[in-house]
A protein has these predicted regions:
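Secretory targeting and sorting signals
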Residues: 2-27
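Beta-rich, blade/repeat-based domains predominating
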Residues: 76-90, 102-109, 124-145, 169-187, ...
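A short loop-to-beta-strand structural motif that recurs across blades of beta-propeller domains
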Residues: 107-112, 150-152, 207-210, 248-250, ...
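Short loop/turn segments that connect beta-strands within beta-propeller blades
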Residues: 114-118, 155-159, 212-216, 253-258, ...
Length: 351
């Protein structure tokens, strides 16, 4: 998952949206569902928030040592996933999936907010989300929403919900899991079946990666077994996807128009590859669901070190803080899920 704010000229996030306007700028009560609004096309303005990665900057090793440990901020959540840093407000959003199930045997999910150093509150109740990303203008979060088997956008100002991708050729997705957005608004997302519940399979047993461009959904790859974490390289020319049930990480060449070309293996073995982010040097940080570590790889796929969170079943990562050198880590042990952080040498991207 990765929006690249270092590219100054944006054509915006062009989405086919179905939303419901709430009062502009109004904070919604924690118990209120996000509103839905009428279909329209959203286009972000030119420009981007202050660049995370200065042009021409040189970076050394990303980790202070070959193996480092993160510090626990708080535990006791249900199951945290999908952290995304919101620079304008100075806070982190993340999905918290309940241990129980709702209708159709599907996990309910709430978006929590963490404002450093120690404040937590509910940002969107009943969000139905897993992985989160940012729109190019940073005014919306783009969410893989398993509750409606689609990809949604939530406006930060009033939490209004929109539909980014409803289906593929009239067939419902399994349960979208993770998402990334290119600086020109092209959206990529993974669709395993982890949270499909007892809803019917409309994908003929396939678990896939999809792309959304100009409101049109197209297939990237349906050969992967349970695709999970997804990210773009800093220049947007490489798409990384973790295949959870294959214990492999793949990479795809991304063309200027957002279409994908050749696929190759990036990392041949990582136990349960889950969420991922990248830093300004192009290093890749991948959460492993099997060993609870964050594995750090160079752009060439060489392992540079590991980060231990202390939590079991590490789920996802995102850079945050004023200088983007704080790596936030979510762990997903059911009913004892936690948020951790560690300071690193290289700044990175907010999801």
């Amino acid at each position: 998952m990765t929006w690249r704010p270092t590219i100054a000229a944006l054509t915006g996030l062009c989405l086919a949206l179905t939303t419901a306007a709430g009062p502009a700028g109004a904070a919604l009560p924690a118990s209120r569902d996000a509103p839905h609004v009428n279909a329209h096309t959203f286009t972000g303005p030119p420009g981007a928030p202050p660049g995370v990665c200065p042009e021409g900057a040189a970076y050394g090793p990303p980790l202070p040592a070959g193996s480092v440990s993160a510090t626990k901020i708080r535990s006791g959540f249900s199951f945290l996933e999908g952290p995304v840093w919101i620079a304008d407000g100075g806070y982190l959003l993340m999905s918290d999936m309940a241990a129980g199930t709702g209708p159709n045997n599907v996990q309910p999910s709430t978006i929590r907010r963490f404002t450093p150093p120690a404040t937590f509150d509910t940002f969107i109740a009943d969000a139905g989300s897993n992985g989160l990303a940012l729109s190019p203008d940073a005014q919306q979060i783009i969410a893989a929403t398993h509750d409606q088997r689609n990809v949604s956008a939530y406006r930060l100002s009033d939490r209004a919900r929109s539909t980014v991708a409803a289906d593929h050729q009239g067939r419902a997705f399994n349960s979208p899991n993770d998402v990334t957005v290119r600086s020109d608004g092209v959206v990529y997302f993974t669709d395993p079946n982890f949270q499909r519940g007892n809803r019917p399979d409309q994908m003929s047993g396939r678990t896939s990666v999809f792309r959304v461009s100009g409101g049109q959904v197209s297939l990237v790859d349906d050969r992967l077994r349970q695709p999970n974490g997804i990210a773009l390289s800093p220049d947007g020319s490489t798409l990384y996807v973790g295949a959870y049930s294959e214990n492999k990480i793949y990479k795809y060449v991304v063309q200027p128009d957002g279409s994908t070309g050749a696929r190759s293996v990036f990392v041949n073995y990582l136990g349960g590859p889950d969420g991922v982010t990248v830093d300004c040097a192009g290093n890749v940080y991948w959460a492993s669901g099997s060993d609870g570590l964050i594995h750090v790889y160079s752009p060439a796929g060489a392992q540079l070190g590991t980060i231990r969170s202390g939590g079991a079943g590490t789920t996802n990562v995102a850079f945050g803080g004023p200088d983007r050198q704080t790596l936030y880590i979510t762990s997903g042990r059911t009913n004892d899920s936690g948020l951790y952080s560690v300071r690193l040498n290289v700044p990175g991207y907010p999801y």
